[in-house]
């Protein structure tokens, strides 16, 4: 009988998607041992099977979620399923745009794939972790793998510098999280997030407030929110571009998933305090991210500051604290997956053919490569929130949810900074489509001849076409995607309890 109870409480089926990722890690390491030629052939196949199986198992869990597993340390509820699906899909697209870049850099493909899958495993586990210990293990799995990926180009001093900066700042963030967790454990005598939330309701104190600040600092680091953003531009510029593409979506999504869970459970009784702090972070992120992006000359640094601003937009939905607000945040992260990875696909293709990352070198690109020009233009317009792109509908839902919850300052700042972002996005587009051939950059004038064949498309082009199609069809896809996001929020028990309490108070 005790064994049966123990088995029921484990509910190991909750981590079947992560088990497929773990098998993929083992498989890629084994083929890497067999030699580079074998790894180049089989590592991508293993990754596709692993991630595809994980996505299928997540889809099957949607109608039968597991709300408590491993003695309450992990939840596979619908919200966790939605975030884990975004992360798994972002990894799949990131790997599609990585193979050619990795081969050209002379790096071992099997080893690279194993580290990316390890980061994915940590990110997915973080989305469902409901215990301080499981959160820390997931967080460090994601972080350590991310440090390795940032410094993967060993011969490039910029990559090593990026990895060192990321390691130092990430280690500080981990230490701050542990310090805050020790306070929470001392106040409650438990490591379970929900239990801690119940125990500290009647124990408001300076220590509790301090633990909230420490935990929020860790969250802000993971989502690259101001003022915890300093690592982002340097790490984005120095890291391999496919790694930047993955970190910009996968790591940020995991950070937001963790933020929603811990703020809605552990700190639900400190609703006003954390919303005030999040409001400040959102305003600073939207303002600084989009204003500083105006002055950038590197495409990757521009996208880095853009990602800081995008984090601020997502925070509008979280601060609103309503079902529509949280659903809008999930929807925008799904939209961000396609428009951001689509932009990075174009940046990678351009850098592979020219070796350049400077924005001015894109001048006149439409003359030599109309497809990259079209794809990058659509993705940048979507990031700016122009209709009828997917990003427009994502921002509209966020702004409506914020306005309905009386978050007027956040919405106004969001609208103003969106206009600012449109300016620097359109500046890049204008540069690519200059009218006179003599205005093209020297890099573009020596651009290699391109032959785009539909048959036998390499993985990078498949990723590019997919992202462009989803981004451009925003008007058609926004409603079904919002319904899925709304379902993820409405069918998650802990969120419904919090929303019910909030509605009663209002």
Curated annotation (Swiss-Prot):
Location relative to the cell: Cellular thylakoid membrane
Subcellular location, principal: membrane
Gene Ontology cellular component terms for the protein in this record: plasma membrane-derived thylakoid membrane
UniProt entry keywords in alphabetical sequence: Membrane, NAD, NADP, Plastoquinone, Quinone, Thylakoid, Translocase, Transmembrane, Transmembrane helix, Transport
Gene Ontology biological process: ATP synthesis coupled electron transport; photosynthesis, light reaction
GO molecular function per UniProt: NADH dehydrogenase (ubiquinone) activity; quinone binding
Highest taxon in the source lineage: Bacteria
Membrane topology: Multi-pass membrane protein
Matches recorded under InterPro entries: NADH-Q_OxRdtase_suN/2, ND/Mrp_TM
EC numbers on record: 7.1.1.-
Reactions the enzyme catalyzes: a plastoquinone + NADH + (n+1) H(+)(in) = a plastoquinol + NAD(+) + n H(+)(out); a plastoquinone + NADPH + (n+1) H(+)(in) = a plastoquinol + NADP(+) + n H(+)(out)
Function description: NDH-1 shuttles electrons from an unknown electron donor, via FMN and iron-sulfur (Fe-S) centers, to quinones in the respiratory and/or the photosynthetic chain. The immediate electron acceptor for the enzyme in this species is believed to be plastoquinone. Couples the redox reaction to proton translocation, and thus conserves the redox energy in a proton gradient. Cyanobacterial NDH-1 also plays a role in inorganic carbon-concentration.
Membership in a protein family: Belongs to the complex I subunit 2 family.
UniProt cross-references to NCBIfam families, sorted A to Z: NDH_I_N, PRK02504.1
Self-association and partners: NDH-1 can be composed of about 15 different subunits; different subcomplexes with different compositions have been identified which probably have different functions.
Protein name per its UniProtKB record: NAD(P)H-quinone oxidoreductase subunit 2
Organism: Prochlorococcus marinus subsp. pastoris (strain CCMP1986 / NIES-2087 / MED4)
